[in-house]
């Protein structure tokens, strides 16, 4: 009797061990949905919260006949005080450079992102001595859309986003 119980326990344990492999090895036929996040690791969309996000699409850029990023920047309702310098008579050392100044808080208070990543500062200083991101190096034809966060986002992005964030998506 003892051997038959022992044998039964062995068969049962072998069945449980090898029987569960088929359960684990089953294929999963679920479709995987692609999720693209630009800007931050905080979940949500521009319409979820109270943050005012303006999205300038490729169609709008084409309708503006924008040939430079300065043309796009000049048409932002929240932009104030950008130094988009094209000639040497008014610009000094910043000739040919463009920048973004949201709400007139200064060139260093607006964060500029390229596909959600921080852009490096230019090697030149503005007329007031501040260092900024030179947006004239961004090709307009490569821009798919521009996302503008119109409020301070220093708690999410850091101190250089006090005035807001401009994200150029390619």
Regions found by a protein language model. Name each.
Residues 28-30, 49, 79-96, 126, ...:
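Short, glycine-/polar-rich solvent-exposed loops and beta-turns at beta-strand/coil boundaries
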Residues 32-34, 48-53, 64, 97, ...:
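Extracytoplasmic
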Residues 42-44, 62-63, 108-109, 118-121, ...:
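Short beta-strands and strand-coil junctions in structured, solvent-facing domains, enriched
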Residues 69-72, 100-101, 113-115, 133-136, ...:
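N-terminal periplasmic accessory domains that precede
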Residues 74-118:
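Extracytoplasmic beta-strand/coil segments of soluble accessory domains associated
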């Amino acid at each position: 009797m003892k051997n038959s119980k022992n044998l039964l326990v062995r068969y049962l344990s072998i069945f449980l061990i090898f029987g569960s492999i088929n359960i684990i090895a089953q294929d999963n036929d679920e479709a995987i949905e692609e999720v693209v996040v630009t800007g931050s690791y905080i979940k949500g969309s521009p319409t979820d919260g109270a943050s005012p996000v303006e999205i300038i699409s490729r169609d709008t850029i084409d309708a503006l006949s924008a040939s430079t990023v300065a043309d796009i920047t000049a048409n932002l309702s929240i932009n104030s005080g950008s130094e988009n310098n094209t000639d040497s008579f008014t610009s000094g050392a910043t000739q040919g450079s463009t920048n973004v100044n949201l709400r007139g808080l200064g060139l260093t208070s607006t964060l500029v992102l390229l596909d959600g990543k921080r852009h490096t500062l230019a090697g030149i200083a503005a007329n007031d001595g501040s260092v900024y991101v030179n947006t004239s190096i961004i090709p307009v034809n490569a821009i798919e859309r521009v996302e503008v966060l119109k409020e301070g986002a220093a708690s999410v992005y850091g101190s250089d986003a006090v005035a807001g964030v401009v994200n150029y998506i390619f």
